[in-house]
Amino acid sequence: MALAHQVRSLATTRFPARLLHGWHHPVMGQFMIRDREAFGRISAMMYGINTLGAALGAALAGFYLPLWLGFNATCVLAIVLSLAVALAAFKLSLRPLPKTIQSNASPEPKTEIAEAPPLPTTRQERRAQERLEKSRQEKRPQNEPSSITSDSPPTAGRKAIMALCFLSGFGVLALEVLWTRMFSQVLENSVYTFATILVIVLVCLALGALVSSGLARLKASPLVVLTLLVLAGAGALIATPHVFMYLTDEMQIVTSTGSWSSYILLIFRTAALTIAPSALILGTIFPYLMKTEEAHMKSPGQSLGRLATINTIGAILGALLCGFLLLDGLGIWRSMQIITLLYLVAALCLPLGWNLRSLVTKAVCLVVLLVNMFALDPASLPIISTDPLAREEKVIEIWEASDCTVAVTESQVGTSIKINSHYSLGSTGAYMQEKLQADLPLMIYPETESLFFLGVGTGISAGGALDPSHKNVKKVVACELVPEVITASKKYMTDFHGFDCTGGLFNDPRATVLVEDGRHYLMATNEKFDIVNADLFVPFRSGAGSLYTKEHFESSKKRLTPDGVFVQWLPLYQLTENEFSIIARTMIEVFDQVSMWRHNFQPGDEIVALIGHQKGQTLPASDIDSWADKLYAISGKDPSDLMRLNLPLDPQTILFFYGGNLTAARELFEDYPLNTDDRPVIEYQAPRSYRKGSSDQPPWLVGAPFANLVDKIQTICPPSDDPLLVNRSTDNRRMPLAGSAFHRARIESLKENTEATQKAWTEFVKEWTATD
């Protein structure tokens, strides 16, 4: 349903504009080409220049314009540029046009046709031209060949050329899908990395077109040149996977400790060395096909339109079939091998004749084909890589899907589910930490009956809501975008050495697991939930920024019951203070109150939850008496026991995790921009800002910087005066201060600062044991 909705949306919003854009090249060719022998050269040059413009547009749109202007203003800019082009075209149309195609051939005897037929500029002129040619053919003796078609290849050869035109579009777009998937295994997958690959492909296609424009000047047989180009492109494709493995050290993540610009240059270099040779050579094929069209051309625009139509249909089918069928059925390496095979078969089928040169060319094609199938078979290459820092990690199972590559790995820390080699969705080794993402908000709001989880991953967090300790939970709905992740979770997380880590998520009648885009589901459904719980999302990954936008927070708020809350988990070890502040400012703009809660107290690995509350909400009171448990937990302990403390966790002591009221301290975030769908600053700034740090001073908001931020928030709005805590007792409202002191003690302990550790420990004990 979601896919069908997206297809309808794209068809209605983009089809009309793309249809009109598709007329540009044929119409320009009709205007510019006045010499039959120059058709191939000029058409290829036009195509190359046009594609260079596309590369420049992709670079600007991928790296700068959305951040500078926003998507809406960028679209307006594109419209203005299109109108300027239209105005320029209108002015050119006022100039007089030549009436005939000029020929560079030597004059023929009078009994032959000395001039090329008139250039048809309108439908009426084309029909008149066809009638005139038919009349000439009827008057010409049967043994006298036509001057226009005498050098034309046979009909079978023309069909082979049209098939190659289709394959050129099919192959290049299918390969772009495969190349993107290939590099998603080794890149951080921000919006910039995908833009880099697109720009490289477009630049190579443009350069290939310009090269083919030069080749069109040669007097060599066009079919021989075309065969050699296809053969060279196939050879480059065979080498691509092996070059990729060499440059990425067997698919290890490509990273740089330098600046953002040095990282982008590293990506450009790695991607260019890997895919540029094949993209450049294959990029010459379609433009050079225009050289073979010279013998058949009656109208430049008509010929260009025909070739472009066939090529574009191939491109559409290539992207669709590769993205939805080939990757699922064959995987990345076998799909690339099949596409290479198609190019080699096409080279063999081109009608070169049976002279020695042609036979040698076909023999070389056969040799390359055998090398592709056996000697350099890419199917033996690894599909994903394992973490070199993980001890004895091994791959258990892999799913190559249209969205991503999903793998289950096993190491000494447990069984993990990963996406694209390096993005971990969770592990059995982090069972308690993942389960706490459900437990913490349910301890704050123990009367919760219905929950929505945006993201399933291992299923541990969503399944945690079904724990018997949460007696009031009646409904859990969880959405996961990647179906193979659900498959992996069902297979490996429900029976981990006989234990169901998902808490019965896939068989409990209260739970519903959907393969759906969670954001879109919240926008479309009419269901209401007491808690909407959004999982951790890496902010600098492409697409993740949309889950931190004002519009998403607004649609989530609409899906809450009157007393419901929205919970957004944030991995501070992947956020700078800039990104955290942007997200906080955006949530403050949407929700009446926003509070911050710690997930853990481990310096360097901090996670927080930002909870959006609706108007008039306060935290519910708790009548649990935890006094004895609190005293027992610290009895006889000192700072050396910081890592071994077993503090009680219940709805009364949960305020120990409370970081503060961000709305009351909104002055700290007012200077930061909002993150919106129109201007997704998170998605475009995060990959840049986190590279501003150094190895000595990491940029993340963890450790002391985070503790300092909490101190600022609690100074502006002390827990004793926090409007969210009015239902709590005076001593209970001192628990957030105990949490802050405990976190500070952990930080100083890691620094081996004994005096500061003791001071923070004393403050922790004071606040932890405080009474009215």
Walk through the language-model features, giving the residues of each.
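SAM/dcSAM-binding transferase cores
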Residues: 618-750
